[in-house]
Amino acid sequence: MAEAGHSQHFLDPEVDALPPDTVSLSDSDSDLSLPDGVGVDALSPGGLPGEASGDSGPDEPPSPPRGLPTEAVQPFHLRGTSSTFSQRSHSIFDGLEGAARRAVPAVTPASPGDGGGFQQLLTPSSQPAAGVPGRAAGSPAAQRAPPVPDYVTHPERWTRYSLDDVAEASEQSNRAAALAFLGPQNLAAPGNYMPSFNQDPSSCGEGRLVFTKPTRASEARPDRKRVSRKVGEPGRGDPGVPGAAGGEGPVELAHLARPGSPEAEEWSGPRGGLQEVGASAGVAHARPGSSPPLVETVGFHGSKKRSRDHFRSRGGSPEAPGAEL
């Protein structure tokens, strides 16, 4: 009875007076409800099983679900609308029917609690259907054959190598082969082998060139070495022998003393003075059994002349001659 009331509501004559251009389908429409005067021929391609049986009672079992829709079933169609709306609805449902035909023909029956009248199609897989010959024939990848390798087309350009007759080698076999190769090489080396110049690989380094700093001419001739010291000053080598080795004395300015001054008399005495002592003089003054001196001592002589009037004697007074200002 509820379905009869809905059909009466759809046949309300007030909606028939509306102009046909007022009904349109667009994305911006907020109210997607159908007008009251629009009639529905079929709600689905297969139709509802409950409606096809007419006014069936609630005690009657529902009819079993049918298979996929056939081509004889009319598509979804609305009556009482404008031509623009009809064309749009036809194009939409034609696209849906085309997508359903291209889908995988596997269906899952609905559960009995859902009414038993609806059929759910499985989601089509991402892989293209294998049973569609048009798509496979039109794809360029299926028509293109794999390229022939160059060594098959032009075998004269290639050289074939095979390792079938080569035995697999291990670490022990590699070591044995290396020792067998190096053995004759060591025996073939000559026994009287001499290394090249300055290339002795031994640790002793016999015949190696040693570079040293050259000595000076004065260091190369120690007999001409001159040191200044007092004659009669005991040396460190032999305290009793004057002029012994290691007995260098302080440098004095006795050569600047004036004649007749106390410094000149002191330096001209028997125990002091400036004189050149040779190797023979050292031997003459040396005691019996003592070693001769290794160096000779001479006085210090300056190369620049200095006036002796500017030097004051050690025991002199300002009244002494030569001390006037």
Swiss-Prot record:
InterPro entries (UniProt xref): TSSC4
Function: Protein associated with the U5 snRNP, during its maturation and its post-splicing recycling and which is required for spliceosomal tri-snRNP complex assembly in the nucleus. Has a molecular sequestering activity and transiently hinders SNRNP200 binding sites for constitutive splicing factors that intervene later during the assembly of the spliceosome and splicing. Together with its molecular sequestering activity, may also function as a molecular adapter and placeholder, coordinating the assembly of the U5 snRNP and its association with the U4/U6 di-snRNP.
A GO biological-process term: spliceosomal snRNP assembly
UniProt lineage: Eukaryota, Metazoa, Chordata, Craniata, Vertebrata
PANTHER family membership: TUMOR SUPPRESSING SUBTRANSFERABLE CANDIDATE 4 TSSC4, U5 SMALL NUCLEAR RIBONUCLEOPROTEIN TSSC4
Organism: Bos taurus (Bovine)
Region of interest (Hom4), ranges: 197-246
Keyword Glycoprotein: no
Chain positions found as Phosphothreonine: 123
Residue ranges with Polar residues bias: 80-90
A Pfam family of this chain: TSSC4
Keywords noted in UniProt: Acetylation, Cytoplasm, mRNA processing, mRNA splicing, Nucleus, Phosphoprotein, Spliceosome
A single MF term (Gene Ontology): protein-containing complex binding
Stated name of the protein: U5 small nuclear ribonucleoprotein TSSC4
